[in-house]
UniProtKB/Swiss-Prot annotation:
HAMAP family: Bpt (MF_00689). One of its GO terms (molecular function) is arginyl-tRNA--protein transferase activity. One of its GO terms (cellular component) is cytoplasm. GO terms for biological process: ubiquitin-dependent protein catabolic process via the N-end rule pathway. InterPro entries: Acyl_CoA_acyltransferase, Asp_Glu_LeuTrfase, N-end_Aminoacyl_Trfase, N-end_Aminoacyl_Trfase_C, N-end_Aminoacyl_Trfase_N. The gene is bpt. This is Aspartate/glutamate leucyltransferase. Disulfide bonds: none annotated.
Length: 231
């Protein structure tokens, strides 16, 4: 397999750090190696499969949930109950009205981030891949679309690519609710893991991922189990 290393650029999550990526550089066979690369700490954004390669900084840790062992916490059970009126629908096609919800979400909640301002081209660049068709987990409330979890379906795992939702419903914790639905769907499909991207302990935006227990983190080139007793 062939890999490339990106130029350094300002880190999106730790303001005083520079980020460098190790990128899978083969023009073909992405589908063949994607799951193996995920198991080695990589992640997909659009057509690109990458992992952090930042020299002295090791803050980014790939994180995944072994779904058969997961049990929701009391707080997560409350979120499930709070959203019991939401209908979950699976779609294999991107739909035109997804973008308007994405634009509203980015322009309301992430004005300080690298994805602002939202554009259709930017949405397509991370959600779509010319070698993989993701699964779209739709959240509906009273007949209205209020959330989308873009999810990759692999042979033995699901991977959470990106979730966006109606920003006026912040009290419903729809991001956490979407992950709970992804775990449930992974169990139903007999998958082993749900990949959640990267955990960065010093980044407040990432803290919700720590709450899905037990989980595994890719540390020093191997997956290490984190359970309640480790906190």
């Amino acid at each position: 397999m062939k890999f490339g290393i990106s130029q350094s650029f300002p880190c999106s999550y730790l303001p005083d750090e520079q980020e460098t990526l190790l990128v899978y550089a083969e023009e073909t066979e992405h589908n063949t190696y994607y799951e193996m690369l995920m198991a080695a700490g990589f992640r997909r954004s659009g057509a690109q499969v990458y992992r952090p390669h930042c020299g002295a900084c090791t803050a980014c840790q790939a994180i995944r949930v072994p779904v058969a062992d997961f049990a929701p916490s009391k707080g997560q059970k409350r979120i499930l109950k709070r959203n019991s009126d939401i209908t979950v629908v699976l779609s294999e096609q991107d739909k035109a009205h997804y973008y308007s919800l994405y634009e509203k979400y980015i322009n309301t909640r992430h004005q300080d981030g690298s994805m602002y301002p939202a554009t259709p081209e930017q949405y397509a660049s991370f959600a779509h891949g010319d070698w993989l068709d993701p699964l779209y987990i739709e959240l509906h409330l009273s007949g209205e679309l209020v959330g989308i979890a873009v999810t990759d379906a692999l042979e033995n795992a699901l991977s959470a690519v990106y979730t966006f939702f109606e920003p006026s419903l912040a009290e419903r914790s729809l991001g956490t609710f979407a992950v709970l639905q992804q775990i449930s769907i992974a169990k139903r499909l007999n998958k082993q893991h749900l990949y959640l991207g990267y955990q960065i302990d010093n980044c407040q935006k990432m803290q919700y991922k720590r709450n899905f227990l037990p989980h595994e983190r890719f540390i020093e080139q191997k997956w290490q189990l984190i359970s309640k007793k480790d906190w």
